[in-house]
Design a protein with these regions (language model features):
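N-terminal secretory signal peptides that target proteins for export/translocation
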Residues: 1-7, 263-265
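A general structural signal for short secondary-structure junctions and capping/turn motifs
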Residues: 3, 27, 114-116, 219-221
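Short, threonine-centered small-residue motifs that mark membrane-proximal processing/anchoring sites
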Residues: 9, 13, 17-28, 228-251
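Extracellular low-complexity, O-glycosylation-prone Ser/Thr/Pro/Gly-rich "stalks"
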Residues: 156-233
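C-terminal membrane-anchoring or membrane-association module
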Residues: 254-265
Length: 265
């Protein structure tokens, strides 16, 4: 027959362990986003990736419609100067940021973000493809990429983009002299068209020297892989919380041992 102190001790240990598990499951995650340019050598490059982990409420553009100011700030020059604040206004609890740096063919870059998977289940992104006047990659629907499942684990580990998934914002007339990466991007002429898929115009830049120093050669076909986003996660260290809970478990263990020592044989 179990003694009362044993039952109580087991309850205390179980409660402390449950608290430790609860703290771990409720904690935010460190999400590392790695991006790779899969385009052929001397083909297209990409501006920094603008991104957000979110609740699925920020819709920056729609196919067949006039491009919004936020997506134009990504597609024309790549800065995201209007995209980032518009995202924050539409979803104040989102985690928003960038994977910085020009991404030339074959290059990989990464950045790490602290994300609450219970609140921000979706992933939204945008990056200018260059050389171009207004080409970009991004997700049309804000709920297209659900990154986390209900348990807080990764629902997807990567996003792969092909040439035929590159967008034309329809906001600027095609003109190599005014194109980013090969011309003067400030010499813009409005096009007043709509967002559509388009990669064929890249061939119009063949033979031009890019800002990265290579002579451009598109080489793209509809099914050419051009971009990949990889995700990996790790727990966020919380030394104070876990130290306190661990100390509690150790204390319970010490009490159990002391009581056992005092029990008559």
């Amino acid at each position: 027959m179990s003694s009362p102190f044993k039952t109580q001790s087991r309850f205390l240990i179980g409660s402390a362990a449950a608290a430790l598990c609860t703290a771990a499951s409720a904690a935010p995650l460190l999400v590392t986003v790695s991006v790779t340019n899969l385009a052929p050598t001397n083909s297209i490059s990409f501006a920094p990736l603008r991104l957000g982990f979110n609740a699925g409420t920020f819709d920056a553009f729609n196919i067949g419609q006039t491009a919004t100011a936020p997506i134009i700030s990504v597609a024309e020059g790549g800065s995201g100067a209007a995209w980032l604040p518009a995202f924050a206004a539409a979803d104040p609890t989102a985690t928003i940021g960038s994977v910085d740096g020009l991404l030339t063919p074959g290059l990989t870059r990464s950045a790490t973000f602290t994300v609450d998977p219970a609140v921000n289940k979706f992933f939204t992104f945008g990056a200018m493809a260059v050389p171009s006047n207004d080409f970009f990659i991004g997700n049309d629907s804000p709920t297209e990429y659900r990154l986390f499942n209900n348990a807080g684990g990764l629902a997807i580990s990567s996003i792969n983009i092909k040439a035929n998934e590159i967008w034309d914002a329809g906001s600027e007339v095609f003109d190599p002299a005014a194109a980013a990466f090969v011309g003067n991007n400030s010499l813009r002429t409005p096009q007043n068209s709509v967002v559509a898929f388009n990669f064929a115009e890249f061939f119009g830049f063949n033979g031009l020297t890019t800002a990265a120093g290579y002579v451009f050669n598109s080489q793209l076909t509809a099914n050419s892989d051009v971009y990949r986003i990889n995700f990996s996660v790790a727990a966020v260290p919380e030394p104070g919380t876990y130290a306190l809970l661990t100390a509690g478990l150790l204390s319970v263990g010490w009490v159990v041992r002391r009581r056992r020592e005092k029990q008559p044989l």
